[in-house]
UniProtKB/Swiss-Prot annotation:
Bridged cysteine pairs (disulfide): none
Listed InterPro entries: RNA_pol_su_RPB10 (IPR023580), RNA_pol_suN_Zn-BS (IPR020789), RPABC5/Rpb10 (IPR000268)
Keywords annotated in UniProt: Chromosome, Cytoplasm, DNA-directed RNA polymerase, Metal-binding, Nucleotidyltransferase, Transcription, Transferase, Zinc
Organism: Thermococcus kodakarensis (strain ATCC BAA-918 / JCM 12380 / KOD1)
Subcellular location field: Cytoplasm; Chromosome
Cofactor(s) this protein requires: Zn(2+)
Signal sequence, start to end: none
Ligand binding (Zn(2+)): C7, C10, C44, C45
PROSITE patterns: RNA_POL_N_8KD
GO MF annotation, one: zinc ion binding
GO cellular component annotations of the record: chromosome; cytoplasm; DNA-directed RNA polymerase complex
Name the record gives this protein: DNA-directed RNA polymerase subunit Rpo10
Catalysed transformations (reactions): RNA(n) + a ribonucleoside 5'-triphosphate = RNA(n+1) + diphosphate
EC number: 2.7.7.6
Length: 65
């Protein structure tokens, strides 16, 4: 839902890389190459960025009581 600040497994900071990753992948670059360029080498960190889905805009529609 919200951009992952850290890797869920190892705790490495990923938030500073997320928007660059997203921008480059949407521009058509290969996700694996982008992760290599950003220095994300651990498979747990790669999984965290690759599998993240932004749902915050859809969730914000509902009221909170």
């Amino acid at each position: 839902m919200i951009v992952p600040v850290r890797c869920f497994t190892c705790g490495k900071v990923l938030a500073d890389k997320y928007y660059e990753f997203k921008k480059r992948v949407e521009a058509g670059e290969d996700p694996g190459k982008v992760l290599d360029d950003l220095g994300v080498e651990r498979y747990c960190c790669r999984r965290t960025l690759l599998s993240h889905v932004e749902l915050i805009d859809q969730v914000m529609v509902y009221k909170v009581y």
